[in-house]
Amino acid sequence: MALTREEVLKIAKLSKLSFEDKEIEKFQVELNDILKYIDMLNEVDTSKVEPLVYINESVNNFREKEEKPSLEIEKVLFNAPESAENAIVVPKVIGE
């Protein structure tokens, strides 16, 4: 399955990226090469391979849960460029 130029443009738009025409052609070739490699990997017979859950025999070495006081809201908001109603204001990136 080869990606068309339009599909590469759609991926770029969804990723909030913009490219020049040369770059789009380059990415189209590179993405198609990646997809060919994935197709090649899909042809490998793995029916007799047991799924690998852990690479080594280690168990989780998490530290014990310890309740700690959180930062005061004033300290958190002190370095924020903009805040409102005890929250940090960030630029909208979804839906643009």
UniProtKB/Swiss-Prot annotation:
GO terms for biological process: glutaminyl-tRNAGln biosynthesis via transamidation; regulation of translational fidelity; translation. InterPro entries: Asp/Glu-ADT_sf_sub_c (IPR036113), GatC (IPR003837). Coiled coil: none annotated. GO terms for molecular function: asparaginyl-tRNA synthase (glutamine-hydrolyzing) activity; ATP binding; glutaminyl-tRNA synthase (glutamine-hydrolyzing) activity. Keywords: ATP-binding, Ligase, Nucleotide-binding, Protein biosynthesis. PANTHER family: GLUTAMYL-TRNA(GLN) AMIDOTRANSFERASE SUBUNIT C, MITOCHONDRIAL (PTHR15004:SF0). This is Aspartyl/glutamyl-tRNA(Asn/Gln) amidotransferase subunit C. The gene is gatC.
